[in-house]
Amino acid sequence: MAATSKKAKKLSASNPVTAAKLPSKPKKSSKKAVLVSSKLSYKGKVFSVFTDTVIEPTGVTNVRDVIRHNGSVVILAVDESKNPKDPEIIFERQYRHAAGQFLYELPAGRVEPNEAPLAAAKREMIEETGFRAKRWTLLTKYFASPGFLGEWMQIYLARDIREGTSQPEADEEIEVFRVRLSEAMALIAANKIHDGKTLIGLMLYDAARRAGKL
């Protein structure tokens, strides 16, 4: 599944994780909410908060606070050179102030304005871990918390990796290490991984491998 230099391949539509049968004609209306007004309530370095007045599909007028974010990328970097059946995953450990604790995570970061997601993934992997990859596959993309957060997260699989020197930002102190896939899945089963993007990426990757899609 080699990718071109400009684009990452995607998992096929036959992937068992993504090809579940959905109703072709939903029983409920597909009508969207109508935006009446939108006011910028807060603008920070990473995101903005808008207070939106909307008419819901039910006809009810509602006021919603919505966080707008440029989107993020997650990198599931794997080293299959030593043991293709149980490859090594590049992991990070870092302190997260909002969570108030150290977390085990996959490398990730935000997409800068006018930056392509794949370019952001390559940049973030170099900055945080020093690794580069020859093959890139888009595993999935999803909304992080769609009730109030308009942020797409895109998970990329990076293969044929080679190690280099990381270039972390001044406020980042990241420990980088390797974990075998079997060990990572055992950590999930033991409730030791508390980061959502990492859980989604690892479980999707493991399921796709078991189904012979990767």
Show which residues each predicted segment covers.
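Short loop segments at secondary-structure junctions
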Residues: T58, D79-N83, Y95, A158-E163, ...
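Unchanged
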Residues: N62, V73-V74, G109-G196
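Acidic, metal-coordinating catalytic segment for phosphate/diphosphate chemistry
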Residues: S37-L76, E80
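Conserved Nudix-box catalytic region and its N-terminal flanking loop in Nudix hydrolases
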Residues: L11, L22, S30-A33, R64-I67, ...
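Nudix hydrolase/Nudix homology domain
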Residues: A2-K28, A33, F102, P113, ...
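Short beta-strand micro-motifs in enzyme catalytic cores
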Residues: S48-D52, E88, F102, W152-Q154, ...
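Acidic pyrophosphate-coordinating catalytic loop
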Residues: L40-G44, H97, Y142-W152, R210
